[in-house]
Amino acid sequence: MRVNKSLTPQDLMAYGINDVQDIVYNPSYDLLFQEELDPNLKGYERGVLTNLGAVAVDTGVFTGRSPKDKYIVRDDTTRDTFWWADKGKGKNDNKPLSPETWQHLKGLVTNQLSGKRLFVVDAFCGANADTRLSVRFITEVAWQAHFVKNMFIRPTDEELVDFEPDFIVMNGAKCTNPQWKEQGLNSENFVAFNLTERMQLIGGTWYGGEMKKGMFSMMNYLLPLKGIASMHCSANVGEKGDVAVFFGLSGTGKTTLSTDPKRRLIGDDEHGWDDDGVFNFEGGCYAKTIKLSKEAEPEIYNAIRRDALLENVTVREDGTIDFDDGSKTENTRVSYPIYHIDNIVKPVSKAGHATKVIFLTADAFGVLPPVSRLTADQTQYHFLSGFTAKLAGTERGITEPTPTFSACFGAAFLSLHPTQYAEVLVKRMQAAGAQAYLVNTGWNGTGKRISIKDTRAIIDAILNGSLDNAETFTLPMFNLAIPTELPGVDTKILDPRNTYASSEQWQEKAETLAKLFIDNFDKYTDTPAGAALVEAGPKL
């Protein structure tokens, strides 16, 4: 069998990259390990070996995505379909870019990559062969090649024989755009997409997550237009084949809660839902490591070994890691191939239709209950609201928990109007007879975060059906159905009012939060379907 290892400099000339010295094509993990630790490397290119066997790298100034530097070329392909930042009521990061400015940025990146020794990784985004993207990543930095090898689906030798990329990602992290002011851009850094050319360009930021979330944004454009749900969620499957999906923004518990020794992991962040069921977009996991401990999260801790890649953690002189140190960023991370988790769906990361849909929120106000069972209209309302507290460090400039509303629990990655995702999800849920729940992994009136132990017991009660059979009462103002008791959960925390010195204190905070919900949802009331959902939200 002949594997296409003969990618040549001529192949890269088609993208505008010239005079390439050498191409390291689909490097092995062993080769990447050597490359990352090369003592001749300088600055952010150079990795450090930790006592756990994983290499740690520093992503520079950018320790999270830079949404203000995200652009989409507005042309005939995207003009009438994309959810644009400069149109309508919704707030998003999809800023339009002219084809002329795109060509300038492309010239900067191709000039940066020309004449260099390059790493090229061919991989898939999407576990379903019918709808996956074949993506070619081009970078001059070994650890960035390692990151995409971890995070995307690694092709077999057979699949590489006739691999033809649908999408090209050119990472020019070392170059910046000096003409940004004249071009009306946000800064010298850029993360730009062209749907006509099927290409992503990166300049100025070293953060690996831009490649991961960039391809997620593209799947979020392509799949819903085919009637396939594209979801910012984790997913797992039980022994009886029962599938659960966990929606939530960064830091709300998607990775932690879906990594469950009693269930097999489908994936931890990005999934589709088609006629056959739920499938992963990725071939790896990207877990937060701040305050990580072997006791609280053994599966994730044990996944940090050779071939895992740590980002922005503090490594002591003896190679040990201080997971409690957030001085560089609270958004410390590790990427690892999904098979570093023992209990995964094999050989392909997909399963049947979901019957449990869990919305994770981290409520900084301490108003919402740890768990509530949603009606069909409440499901749509809370999906479109996407409320959480924005947690420290996943974006630049955010260091304290602040409340935020992110449509579909992932507005930063949406390419179409949020209602299109809600419509597709609801159709899939109705066909599967799925039930939705709102789970608060954040804070309560004590000012303490709800414990992982209690949250895990709540998830168990959802998955084993005991929550559906529990007696419930209704929380005023938010009209949420709350169980009176659940196995293994401290009954006192189920009603958030009980965690305050007085119910008046809860009432005061609840009114503040309810008003935020109502004001946020106003942007959906310009359609009859959106206006009809107002009744499912909080009432003052």
Curated annotation (Swiss-Prot):
Q: Where is the major localization of this protein?
A: cytoplasm
Positions where N6-acetyllysine occurs in the chain: 87, 523
Give the matching Pfam families: PEPCK_ATP
Q: What is its EC number?
A: 4.1.1.49
Q: Which GO terms describe its cellular component?
A: cytosol
Where does the record say this protein resides? Cytoplasm
Where does this protein hold ATP? Answer: 213, 232, 248-256, 297, 333, 449-450, 455
Name this polypeptide is given = Phosphoenolpyruvate carboxykinase (ATP)
Listed A to Z, the keywords are: Acetylation, ATP-binding, Cytoplasm, Decarboxylase, Gluconeogenesis, Lyase, Manganese, Metal-binding, Nucleotide-binding
Q: Which GO terms describe its molecular function?
A: ATP binding; metal ion binding; phosphoenolpyruvate carboxykinase (ATP) activity
Which gene holds the coding sequence for this protein? pckA
Q: Which family does it belong to?
A: Belongs to the phosphoenolpyruvate carboxykinase (ATP) family.
Q: How does it assemble?
A: Monomer.
Entry annotated with the keyword Mitochondrion: no
Keyword Cytoplasm among record annotations? yes
Q: So which cofactors does this thing need?
A: Mn(2+)
Q: Which residues bind Mn(2+)?
A: 213, 232, 269
- Origin organism of this chain? Escherichia fergusonii (strain ATCC 35469 / DSM 13698 / CCUG 18766 / IAM 14443 / JCM 21226 / LMG 7866 / NBRC 102419 / NCTC 12128 / CDC 0568-73)
Q: Which reaction does it catalyse?
A: oxaloacetate + ATP = phosphoenolpyruvate + ADP + CO2
